[in-house]
Amino acid sequence: GIMDTLKNLAKTAGKGALQSLLKMASCKLSGQC
């Protein structure tokens, strides 16, 4: 249903945000930003 779709969208968005945060953190730690 719609709720399942929204939950999946939230999961996907959360994963994307986490990945970009991890990328930023790792590039700052390695000094390659």
Swiss-Prot record:
The keyword Disulfide bond applies. It is found in: Secreted. GO terms for cellular component: extracellular region. Its main location: secreted. Pfam families: Antimicrobial_2. Disulfide bonds join 27-33. This is Brevinin-2Rh. It comes from Pelophylax ridibundus. The lineage of its organism: Eukaryota, Metazoa, Chordata, Craniata, Vertebrata.
